[in-house]
Swiss-Prot record:
Belongs to the dihydroorotate dehydrogenase family. Type 2 subfamily. It comes from Citrobacter koseri (strain ATCC BAA-895 / CDC 4225-83 / SGSC4696). Its cofactor is FMN. Its main location: membrane. This is Dihydroorotate dehydrogenase (quinone). GO terms for molecular function: dihydroorotate dehydrogenase (quinone) activity. Catalyzes the conversion of dihydroorotate to orotate with quinone as electron acceptor. Transmembrane segments: none annotated. Signal peptide: none annotated.
Amino acid sequence: MYYPFVRKALFQLDPERAHEFTFQQLRRVTGTPLEALVRQKVPAKPVSCMGLTFKNPLGLAAGLDKDGECIDALGAMGFGSIEIGTVTPRPQPGNDKPRLFRLVDAEGLINRMGFNNLGVDNLVENVKKAHFDGILGINIGKNKDTPVENGKDDYLICMEKIYAYAGYIAINISSPNTPGLRTLQYGEALDDLLTAIKNKQNDLQTIHHKYVPIAVKIAPDLSEDELIQVADSLVRHNIDGVIATNTTLDRSLVQGMKNCDETGGLSGRPLQLKSTEIIRRLSQELKEQLPIIGVGGIDSVIAAREKMAAGATLVQIYSGFIFKGPQLIKEIVTHI
């Protein structure tokens, strides 16, 4: 299709500039008749997960549309779900640029964005304007200047503001680009956070008369013992789902490539096997007590099928979407 030509032009630009340019164009069409320019017909393949019905099993992973600016245009491409964010209570600029790097030969990306976003209030206003008929997930995190020991307060603030508008809420405790954030995945810190989140979910369910499921997004770099502990905590706290995985700090598959030594999280094809193995082990530990949303290096129908064979109920794409374009959505939904 036309995307290889578009990609060639975009890849002449700095990665973040290419992202900004693309979103400028998408903002122009989102919510207008011009959405027809990006619309794709995909078959209906409903899937039940977390008490919700997804019109197909393919979602857009968090990080692409951090502020929910282009929900309708992205939805027109055929996604069954879109996860916007990560959003924080207050706006923040993120880390210094450059902070996004391509590993073209490996079809991977390294980012150290640092939760750059315009804040939760801005995101909510964008969500109110959207008409996406799929499931909208909202991914939340903590502000960089919030001490880790107070981090749960940021998640609770975001939950309160987005609850009425979210199909599900994703708790991001696994980005490698916010200092100390990944420590919330372990032991007492995780139990304390999940207790607070479940209590808040119960309170908000009473206020809004609807139940919004909670999914926790985990890292691919967990040790075996850490993975077992995380799985146990998710089950004990009745969390509704788990998103596996975020980006990796491992560089073993990209040694010697341009940009391989940049600090940040690695995504795309080099993450594919590692994330699939985490899904497989999680599935064994969870024993179908809660569903897994599989993400990490999905760039083909085969890769999507591998995630589902490992135990994922739903799958998400991000880097594969950058490298392969909207056609990947149609291919996966049609043939998965």
